[in-house]
C-alpha cells in the first residue's frame, strides 16, 4: 500500500513506533515498512494536504498479536483515538488516527473467531 504525505518521515516514524514493523528501510524516495508479507510505502507528495480529507473512506487494518501493547504504544505517542480499544466477544479492536489523520485499526482476533473464519473458507 502506498500512503502519500507532506511529511513522510514523521508518518514513517509513527508507524514504526506504534506497530513495530519487521523491517524499516528506504528505497529511492520511498519509506518502506514491512509487516509480515504486507509492505507500507510512504511517499512525499506536494499535491496532497497535510491531513486526510475523508479519513473514514479507507481504514488500514493491522492484525496484531497484542492489541493492548500496541494501544499502549499509541497512547505513549499521543495518538488520537476514533474508537478506543474494546473487547468484542473476545476479540480486540481499536481505531486510531495516524499523524496525517488516516484511520488505522488494530485487530486481535480471539482463537474462537479465528477458528470460525477458517471454517468459512
Question: At which residue positions do the language-model features occur?
Answer:
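Vicinal oxygen chelate
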Residues: 20-65, 71-97, 108-121
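Conserved active-site tyrosine of GNAT-family acetyltransferases
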Residues: 11-16, 74, 101
Amino acid at each position: 500500500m502506498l500512503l502519500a504525505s507532506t511529511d513522510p518521515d514523521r508518518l514513517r516514524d509513527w508507524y514504526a513506533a506504534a506497530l513495530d514493523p519487521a523491517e524499516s528501510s528506504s528505497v529511492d524516495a520511498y519509506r518502506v515498512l514491512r509487516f509480515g508479507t504486507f509492505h507500507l510505502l510512504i511517499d512525499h507528495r506536494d499535491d496532497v494536504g497535510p491531513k486526510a480529507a475523508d479519513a473514514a473512506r479507507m481504514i488500514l487494518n493491522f492484525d496484531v498479536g497484542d492489541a493492548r501493547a500496541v494501544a499502549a504504544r499509541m497512547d505513549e505517542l499521543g495518538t488520537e483515538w476514533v474508537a478506543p480499544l474494546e473487547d468484542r466477544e473476545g476479540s480486540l479492536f481499536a481505531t486510531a488516527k495516524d499523524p496525517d489523520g488516516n484511520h488505522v485499526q488494530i485487530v486481535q482476533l480471539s482463537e474462537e473467531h479465528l477458528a470460525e473464519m477458517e471454517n468459512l473458507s
